[in-house]
Amino acid sequence: MSGEQKHQYHLVEPSPWPALGSAAGFTLFLGLTLFMHEYPYSIYVLMAGLFMVLATMFFWWRDVVREAEYQGHHTPIVQIGMRYGMIFFICSEVMFFVAFFWAFFDSSLYPDTGVWPPADIVALDPFDLPLINTLILLLSGCTVTWSHHALQHNNRKDFIRGIVLTIILGAIFTAVQAYEYQHATFGFTDGIYASTFYMATGFHGFHVLVGTIFLTVCLFRGLKGHFSPEHHFGFEAAAWYWHFVDVVWLFLFICIYWWGG
């Protein structure tokens, strides 16, 4: 990478991370598919794919941070492009969840057995752990907004506190959902209700994990003084992503846990 920026436009330099990220994503979803079909050793493929995805995220973020903080490549025009890129990325993620909701409503509004949920399924009580997780995520949306406002007012102490609280709440949400899965009375292969339930909520849980990692990166960057009230798009993008995760969970809670159960 060149250490000098002679223009304000975003010219992408050669990088291995897009290709490696694609290979990592393919391995992760291959492992997930094999795991769903209960192939032997599929868990190892799944774990390898997850490790590859996390490693790619780490090194790609490292390069982006270097370009922003040490090489001065993130000019105002580049930052505008990154904002559009993040918006389009979130829109593409919305389409993933639209597909899952479509599958769920198609199955629930016109069930083959005439009854929804199917008679052999004991649905989870929406006002037990799902409601607790809803309150946790809503609170985390407040803490990340508090952190953002603190940074805009150059209050670094509250900025850090807000990120830490959001990360803790995200970890608690993940732990509660894992506990819920462990104690559910139905498994992934127990019909269309179970498969759409686990695909939608599990994919959301993966997004919570990614968002928590995203905020953790922002925490370490904040501790190193990387953000200022004028320049903090890295954290702003993480906050957008976290709010997106919050909104998706509200739809999951209302449509799948409450109405669909």
Explain the meaning of each model-derived region.
Residues 1-261:
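...captures the hydrophobic TM-helix bundle architecture rather than a specific catalytic motif
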